[in-house]
Design a protein with these regions (language model features):
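Short helix-initiation/N-cap motifs at beta->coil->alpha
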Residues: 70-79, 98, 170-174, 254-268
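Hinge/lid segment of periplasmic solute-binding proteins
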Residues: 98-149, 290-294, 357-363
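A structural signal for short loop-to-beta-strand junctions that line the ligand-binding cleft
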Residues: 83, 90-91, 121-157, 302-303, ...
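Glycine-centered hinge/linker elements that transmit conformational signals in sensory
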Residues: 178-180, 224-255
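Extracytoplasmic/periplasmic solute-binding protein
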Residues: 140-144, 149, 173-227
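Conserved C-terminal helix/tail region of periplasmic/extracytoplasmic solute-binding proteins
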Residues: 159-160, 165, 247, 375-422
């Protein structure tokens, strides 16, 4: 998650993939192979663990086989672009869900609408992922891995500060109050801080701040992803609360310059009272650490999450569409979702399986799974250039809102809209 959030611009991708031409196909493939088939699959390192578990389980129980190649996250988009330009894509490839619309519009994925329609649980697939994998009413991808933003709180620090360790924040205002209490009661020696965030990381801001906007009933863009609403309430209300936390020194001192790689590293050390975190980090926390998990809320309540992670599709140049679909559809099955994903405390791609024999052992996991149906994944054709790029306009706006001159927000918001419309 941390490397994904740092993000890279995808201008080069669009230039390279323009050589591919054509649409996403109609669900057919070239001459299919007879007998057992070995298909190729690419994924980025950020989702290596989940991908390897799925492939291992499939290969051990099927005649067809999947050959998985894991590519360094920072090299993944250029690698996909180069392969697309040379018409040498693998049979199956996963992608950061945020960038799926770009791949789909370039014709890199096969149209699998009819195949998805035949799934008995087609209406139970992670809605945000399915939305971004749909173009002009046709569907091209399935959810692969999911990573959600939630609030973690350290129960031991809460108890030491005189807070109820079993009651995390239900509103962003409560979040701020509890973080401030932690800072006031425990932060005098500089080893403990109320909260933390990635203050110099565009992807970190969208992942952790935007859910508060959605929870309050607002939006950060129009539905087409071409107009920014980040200079309006409730976004400005969210910025104000976080700015007050920073001004009161209730935030770890390195937050202002945190570019993403280490923003989740302070909480597991027991140094932070309460903060937004990726759901995937829950299983990585120290075993003896008492952690509460609660949905991200708006200033006065509500709940939402940023539904991140990767979607997966069949390449439009595959010669093994049927074999590829056999694998992809299996990854959505009860067996794969429960015995592979849930068993390892991963977030499930199907909302009807959110409570299962493994997740029920940990109420926090049940809660995280339940948010898949409530969260959002923002759509914008130029998301990477605008929001993830460290030189993009979003990071400038967010930093002025928190650390600088908030009166500049209308001007900087216009720059975001300009970038979205280029």
């Amino acid at each position: 998650m941390r490397r994904r959030l740092a993000g890279i611009a995808i201008l080069g991708l669009l230039a390279l993939t323009s050589a591919c031409g054509g649409g996403g196909g109609n669900g057919s493939s070239a001459e299919p192979a007879e007998g057992p088939v070995t298909i190729t699959m690419w994924t980025r390192a950020a989702t290596q663990a989940q991908s390897e578990r799925l492939v291992k389980a499939y290969n051990s129980s099927h005649k067809n086989q999947v050959k998985l190649t894991v590519i360094p996250t920072d090299n993944y988009q250029p690698r996909i672009a180069a392969a697309a330009g040379a018409k040498q894509l693998p049979d199956v490839f996963a992608a950061d869900v945020i960038f799926v619309p770009n791949y789909t519009s370039q014709g890199l994925f096969l149209d699998i609408t009819d195949r998805i329609a035949a799934l008995p649980y087609k209406d139970k697939l992670a809605p945000s992922h399915m939305k971004l994998g749909t173009m002009d009413g046709r569907q091209y991808t399935l959810p692969h891995t999911l990573d959600l933003s939630v609030w973690f709180w350290n129960k031991d620090l809460y108890e030491k500060a005189g807070l109820d360790p079993e009651k995390g924040p239900k509103t962003l205002k409560e979040f701020a109050q509890q973080a401030t209490t932690i800072q006031d009661k425990l932060g005098k020696d500089g080893k403990v801080h109320g909260t933390f965030f990635g203050g110099n990381c565009g992807g970190c801001y969208v992942f952790t701040f935007w859910p508060s906007v959605w929870a309050a009933g607002g939006q950060v863009m129009n539905a087409e992803g071409t107009t920014s609403l980040n200079d309006q309430p409730p976004m400005t209300d969210v910025f104000k609360i976080w700015r007050e936390l920073y001004d009161k020194k209730a935030v770890g001192p390195t937050a202002k310059e945190e570019q993403g790689p280490t923003w989740t590293g302070f909480f597991p050390k027991g140094e932070i009272g309460v903060m937004p975190m990726p759901s995937t980090t829950l299983g990585l926390m120290p075993k003896d650490m008492k952690i509460g998990v609660t949905p991200i809320a708006g200033p006065d309540g509500g709940e939402s999450t940023f539904v991140g992670g990767d979607s997966v599709g069949i390449s439009s140049t595959t010669k093994n569409a049927d074999a590829a679909w056999d694998f992809l559809s299996w990854t959505m099955s009860d067996d794969a979702q429960v015995e592979v994903m849930a068993k390892n405390k991963d977030v499930l791609a199907r909302t009807d399986l959110s409570s299962n024999k493994y997740s029920s052992e940990d109420p926090r996991v049940v809660l995280i799974n339940s948010l898949v149906a409530k969260g959002q994944t923002p759509f914008a054709p130029r998301f990477g250039q605008t929001y993830n790029d460290p030189q993009g306009p979003w990071l400038r706006l967010a930093r002025e809102a928190i650390f600088g001159d908030a009166s500049k927000l209308p001007q900087l918001n216009a720059e975001i809209t300009k970038s979205l419309q280029q």
